Design a protein with these regions (language model features):
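Catalytic Walker B motif of ABC-type/P-loop ATPase nucleotide-binding domains
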Residues: 130-134
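Conserved ABC nucleotide-binding domain
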Residues: 32-33, 92-108
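Helix-to-loop junction immediately C-terminal to a conserved catalytic motif
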Residues: 13
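A short, surface-exposed alpha-helical micro-motif characterized by mixed small hydrophobic
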Residues: 170-172
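Helical segment within the ABC ATPase nucleotide-binding domain
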Residues: 144-156
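ABC ATPase NBD Q-loop/coupling interface
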Residues: 22-42, 81
Length: 207
């Protein structure tokens, strides 16, 4: 805690402006000159730790809101989806394991399923970079394993950055691990490299 993980995501998404430095997406897009909405439009999506789904609406309606985000809420729900949009929704629902739950109120879903629903909503916005904040906090072991597989699948299609304290979960998904300490990068590399790094051992294990 306090290493700077959430602040890093806040800076990338435009919620917080840094005192100094530069933030580029790819080689050319200077994020410091963009608003939060513009940053989302260039392809950066964020999922917060606590699920923020509409619990009284069905899974289908929540996904519809993600598809039709350029209209007012009730207008979005009344709008007819095109065949292509329905296909995209079904594909996302299948990918997150909720295809059979489309008509269920989101409030009836388990904690893990709500997390998956929000990931599905993010998917429908077609981000090139997904920022996922502590996705498995409060999940059952089975949900954690399903989430690990989901994030691995997503990483084959786009860049995915996950902030997480559960090291076993990190080990199961990460290709590259970055350790932050007091707002700075302390170490980066494979899980084995990071765990063997003397600086990480000193700071986080007190040895």
């Amino acid at each position: 805690n306090g290493a700077g993980k959430t602040t890093l995501m806040d800076v990338i998404t435009g919620k917080t402006r840094p005192d100094e430095g530069q933030v580029f997406f790819g080689d050319r897009i200077d994020l410091l000159h963009l608003t939060e909405a513009q940053i989302a439009e260039v392809g950066i999506g964020r999922k917060f730790q606590k699920p923020t789904v509409f619990e009284r609406l069905s899974v289908r309606d929540n996904l519809t809101l993600a598809l039709k985000q350029d209209r007012r809420v009730w207008a979005m729900l009344r709008a007819r989806l095109s065949g292509a949009e329905r296909d995209r929704m079904d594909e996302a629902a299948a990918q997150i394991g909720l295809l059979d739950a489309l008509e269920r109120p989101a409030g009836e879903l388990s904690h893990g399923q709500k997390q998956w629903l929000e990931i599905g909503m993010l998917l429908l916005q077609e981000p090139r970079l997904m920022l996922i904040d502590e996705p498995v906090a409060g999940m059952t072991r089975g949900e954690i394993e399903r989430t690990a597989q989901l994030l691995q699948d997503l990483a084959g299609e786009r860049s995915v950055v996950v902030v997480e304290h559960d090291m076993e979960f990190v080990r199961s998904i990460a290709r590259r691990v970055t350790v932050l300490h007091q707002g700075h990068v302390l170490a980066e590399g494979s899980m084995a490299q990071v765990q063997a790094d003397p600086r990480v051992i000193e700071v986080y294990l007190g040895e």
